[in-house]
Amino acid sequence: ISELPDDRYLFRYYTHDPWWANSPWLDRYGREAHDIYLPMAVTRIDADGNVKLPTHLTFLTIDDSYGNMPEQVPSEVIPHILQGRRTSPDQPGLIVWVYPFDEYHDWAYKQPERIEEIYYGDWFIQQAINDGFPMNTVVSSGNFTKLMEEGKNTFDESILVSIVPDAGSEMEKQLMKFVENGGKLFVYGPSSHASKEFLDFLNIKTVEPISGEMKMKLRLKSDRIKVPGSDILKHNADMSGGGIETVVNNSADPGTKVLAQAFLGNQKRDVVVQRQEKEWNGGMVTYLRGTNSATYRGGHLLTPDDPDKWFNGSSLLRYSLDNMGYSIHFDKLKAGLKNPINCISRCDNAFYFSGFTPNQTIEQQWLFPQGAPIFTGYETELRNGMAHYRMPKSYQEECRVFVKQDEGVVSCYEVAPVEWNVKRRIGINGLKQATVRIYPGADDTHFEVVNNVGYPYNKPSLERKKGTDYAGTYYEFENITGELIAIW
């Protein structure tokens, strides 16, 4: 959906099957709505920088394999569809994929030797999403370049994810400009076609590529796994766009950190390299070589490598978010348990966390630069400042509150608005000398917050201090203990 002939595209949901004897809503999905909320949290950015949602909705099908039309299915599915649409993205999400649409087309026709890079690139991102990397927005490389050339601020509140751009391309220029102006960028994939200028920007150089079974060394916070998996990465050059050919160029550069390395015998390659310069106004770029941790074993699709036996190369993308201030980690019993899949989208100034939890024994741990996310209607235990959640099988949860507090149980909940000129009230409790950041609705004209006041909440509002350090429109309140009621 990054490039379309016009603005039309389709969302189709699988309720019944007219050929095979199954009704997916009832059996395959088990009446869980993850395949509604996750795709409906996804959006594209057009050439004008606008968010574009699906224009058409279809169902396959309204009748089951026997021609029956049980009322239960539409009665249960339609509310989820309406909720998903009501909270669909209205701005780019936390993470935006700059999809190389034109580049892939040109490689296929003019540089067929690079087709393996196309195959690798899509598989690597697919695996990262399945690992829990919370990306929800896509823009084509052509539209990205156009918007940047026009000076649009479309991506100012997002982290970008891109392939290594071709030498001398306009995309190369605009990606560097984005970082130098304070943006955060992930670059992944083979670097052999990059310019010297871009390699210097990343502070890497290319050497002899290696592939095979390599021992990994991480300087990244990773998931907590009771029975750890392997630290051996299987990098198949055929499935990963070639071998691993990158090392740091200038190891004395104080702005460069090597976050992950791969070792094959006495050969070492730097597979995750982060760089940041003072002149970049907080900008940061992280290069990941990226491994497609999957093997062809016959059939239509690759088979993911067993995490109990092999290191999952796609996990490095999520782990590297930690160094950009976004900590998303899982606590699980063993490596082979499937990770939760997450999307983080934005609507009406809120953050929406949509997801699927294949195994509910897994605990999710979250921390953003602005604090621990406190979902509306949830309680969470804060440990070392991080929010800990055991999520349901499928979910779409609103987050308007972030709390900086080391320990404790914090909750966020709806409070009846009661008054005629109040749209909404939410409460936040369990605070202990906390810094609280609240994202009210887009219309915050009458926003106010009271501390430790019961109904009718007529105590004067705390001083409203609009924050500027982080994404979005939010208000910051410091040294708060007890309960806050936010009103707008």
Question: Residue spans of the language-model regions?
Answer:
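Exposed, low-structure sequence patches enriched in small/polar residues
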Residues: Y99, K217-S222, I244-N249, V272-Q276, ...
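Short acidic, S/G/P-rich loop/turn micro-motifs used as interaction or catalytic elements
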Residues: H16-W20, D63-N68, F101-Y109, V164-M171, ...
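Aromatic-Pro/Gly-enriched surface loop or interdomain linker
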Residues: R44-N50, D63-F155, D348
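Extracellular ligand-binding/catalytic regions of CAZymes and related secreted enzymes
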Residues: D27-L94, N266-W488
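Catalytic-core regions of glycoside hydrolase
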Residues: I1-D63, I129-P134, S141, V161-A167
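Helical hinge/lid and interdomain linker segments adjacent to catalytic or ligand-binding clefts
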Residues: I115-K205, Q360-T361
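Short, Gly/Ser/Thr-enriched beta-strand-loop segments that form substrate-interacting elements
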Residues: P254-V272
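A glycine-rich, often tryptophan-bearing local segment used as a flexible ligand/cofactor-contacting loop or short
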Residues: E170-V247
